[in-house]
């Protein structure tokens, strides 16, 4: 009986690791779909999967997937100087989105309440992204350059909020995916 339990734990750990790697790849891929911003940096669709990583994988695995996938995309896109900040900012986004979403939605079965909880959680996560990059760019460049990226980061945040809210709603209603993500 004990060997069976150990095998289940190893399989569960392996499944989480593989799922986190998949989400890191999704974060990487969607971050690579980027548009250079006029002042500094670039806008992308990676925030959608950063938020989904937090909601679906939990704070530890979600933060690891979000931080690693997006930081590697920074390096691949030639923004290696941003990679350390991106790792921290996106990991924090995933953690905050997880805890706020969990706190607000709880075990509610009411779809409207769950969607609202995820939207509020996404907004809080995106505030961390906007504030985090503003602070980093203020130190790296100056406040004027950092202020110039606020509009682009805000548009990126809005896209991340909308896309992640739509996708989490679709995922929650999918019977197939509830086996992969039993906490839904």
Please state what every model-predicted region is.
Residues 1-184:
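Loop-helix junctions at membrane interfaces
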């Amino acid at each position: 009986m004990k060997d069976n339990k150990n095998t289940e734990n190893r399989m569960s750990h392996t499944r989480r690791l593989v799922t986190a790697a998949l989400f890191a790849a999704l974060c990487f891929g969607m971050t690579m779909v980027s548009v250079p911003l006029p002042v500094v940096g670039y806008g992308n669709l990676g925030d959608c999967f950063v938020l989904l990583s937090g909601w679906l994988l939990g704070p530890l695995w979600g933060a690891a997937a979000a931080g690693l996938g997006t930081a590697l995309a920074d390096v691949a896109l030639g923004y290696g100087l941003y990679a350390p900040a991106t790792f921290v900012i996106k990991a924090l986004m995933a953690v905050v989105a997880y805890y706020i979403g969990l706190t607000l939605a709880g075990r509610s079965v009411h779809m409207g309440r769950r969607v609202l909880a995820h939207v509020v959680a996404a907004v809080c996560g995106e505030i961390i992204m906007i504030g985090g990059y503003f602070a980093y760019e203020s130190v790296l460049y100056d406040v004027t350059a950092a202020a110039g990226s606020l509009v682009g980061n805000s548009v990126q945040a809005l896209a991340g909020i909308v896309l992640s809210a739509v996708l989490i709603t679709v995922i929650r209603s999918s019977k197939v995916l509830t086996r992969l993500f039993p906490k839904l």
